[in-house]
Curated annotation (Swiss-Prot):
Disordered: annotated segments: 1-55
Protein name per UniProt: Spermatid nuclear transition protein 1
Source organism, top-level taxon: Eukaryota
Purpose: Plays a key role in the replacement of histones to protamine in the elongating spermatids of mammals. In condensing spermatids, loaded onto the nucleosomes, where it promotes the recruitment and processing of protamines, which are responsible for histone eviction.
Keyword check for Protein biosynthesis: no
GO MF entries: DNA binding
Keyword set includes ATP-binding: no
Keywords: Chromosome, Developmental protein, Differentiation, DNA-binding, Nucleosome core, Nucleus, Phosphoprotein, Spermatogenesis
UniProt record, GO biological process: chromatin remodeling; flagellated sperm motility; heterochromatin formation; negative regulation of DNA-templated transcription; nucleosome disassembly; positive regulation of protein processing; sexual reproduction; single strand break repair
Subcellular location(s) of the protein: Nucleus; Chromosome
Organism the protein comes from: Rattus norvegicus (Rat)
Tissues of expression: Testis.
Pfam families recorded: TP1 (PF02079)
Residues bearing PTM Phosphoserine: 36-37, 40
Amino acid sequence: MSTSRKLKTHGMRRGKNRAPHKGVKRGGSKRKYRKSSLKSRKRGDDASRNYRSHL
């Protein structure tokens, strides 16, 4: 009884917490990461270009 009860509560809790948390984390981090990656990519290219030209 205790095992089945534990599994049921664990599964319900995991599913409930996992679905919304994953969605929010994915959407927010994806947008932020995309913007930052684009900016950092441009900066990295400029830095490498300047560094190479300097050398």
